[in-house]
A protein has these predicted regions:
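Residue(s) in the substrate-gating loop at a strand-loop-helix junction
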Residues: 20
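Short, flexible catalytic-loop segment of classical short-chain dehydrogenase/reductase
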Residues: 24, 62-73
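Short C-terminal tail/terminal secondary-structure segment
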Residues: 25, 102, 114-129
Length: 129
């Protein structure tokens, strides 16, 4: 709500929420986390409908396995095994790859995209669809 007055004054207002692939297909390891991220997905869709008439786009990125502080404690061998078995690209992503997708949703080329839920997951959800 605090940002809305500023977004309304912007030439190309964008909101990009970050959820997780856990919101799209829970692994059963952490139900509260999956539920919270699913809430972000629902909020994104509701905001897209509510703010669309004002020209504000709202989209959501759902990172999959990415090398972050959250995944740092996982042994490297375990990460590699998981990625080979579960992702089409057979690797963990880098934070920069998520950042680049976030930036791309703020470019003029994305001006007609709103309410989208975009997995940035190396093909994890494609294999689980």
């Amino acid at each position: 709500r605090t940002a809305l007055p500023h977004l309304r004054k912007s030439k190309s207002p964008r909101i990009v929420n970050i959820a997780s692939t856990e919101a799209l297909g829970a692994t059963g390891r952490d139900s509260p986390y999956a539920a919270a991220k699913a809430g972000v997905v629902g909020l994104t869709r509701a905001m897209a409908v509510d703010l669309g008439p004002e020209g504000i786009t709202v989209n959501c990125i759902c990172p999959g396995p990415v090398r972050t502080g959250m995944t740092a404690p996982i042994p490297e061998d375990d990460k590699n095994t998981y990625a080979r078995r579960r992702t089409a690209l057979r690797r963990y992503g880098d934070p920069e790859e998520v950042a680049h997708m976030t930036l791309s949703l703020c470019l003029p080329a994305a001006s007609f995209l709103t309410g989208a839920i975009i997995p940035v997951d190396g093909g994890l959800m494609a294999r689980n669809a």
